[in-house]
Amino acid sequence: MVEGEASSPAFTIDYAVATGDWPAEDVLRGLVERAVTAAAARTDGPLQASLSVLFTDDAEMRALNARFRGKDKPTNVLSFPAPDSMVPPGTPRHFGDIALGYETVSREAKEEGKSFEHHLTHLVVHGFLHLAGHDHETEVEAEEMEQLEREILQSLAIGDPYA
């Protein structure tokens, strides 16, 4: 497992590459920093916070999805918002954790004719928006979240992921 830390203007980002054929650490770090910085600029999240990102494989994503969502199948991204009650007074808030599954991310990018990096950036943005309280349980919520994703990705020169 490769672990490290990076900082965006408002976030300290801890990352871990557990398993999977992920790009090099510096590529992942740059991608996550750009995605988080762009998404944070468009949300009402905290001014300072920490965030953890786990790059793993479908086996671990399946286990996490089963444990926390009751769905016994792998998924591309999972988000785990940190409760505010976990923050000791005077310390930066831990915003939450994002986990990404390599095989699903890779397969989806190929099936949808997208670059792996663009699809991964989209999923980091998507996961971050979940941490910020956005959801897509209803059609209205989904439309609002997807539009926000489009705007954030456009600011990163990435095309509409839903086109």
UniProtKB/Swiss-Prot annotation:
Transmembrane segments annotated in the record for this chain: none
Cytoplasm among keywords: yes
Any GO molecular function: zinc ion binding
Keyword rRNA processing recorded: yes
Note on how the cofactor is bound: Binds 1 zinc ion.
Binding annotation for Zn(2+): 126, 130, 136
EC numbers for this chain: 3.1.-.-
Primary site of residence: cytoplasm
Classification via InterPro entries: MetalPrtase_cat_dom_sf_prd, YbeY, YbeY_CS
Locations listed in the record: Cytoplasm
Cofactor: Zn(2+)
Keywords: Cytoplasm, Endonuclease, Hydrolase, Metal-binding, Nuclease, Ribosome biogenesis, rRNA processing, Zinc
Function: Single strand-specific metallo-endoribonuclease involved in late-stage 70S ribosome quality control and in maturation of the 3' terminus of the 16S rRNA.
Recorded family membership: Belongs to the endoribonuclease YbeY family.
Xref: HAMAP family: Endoribonucl_YbeY
Name of the protein: Endoribonuclease YbeY
Organism (species): Chelativorans sp. (strain BNC1)
Gene transcribed to yield this protein: ybeY
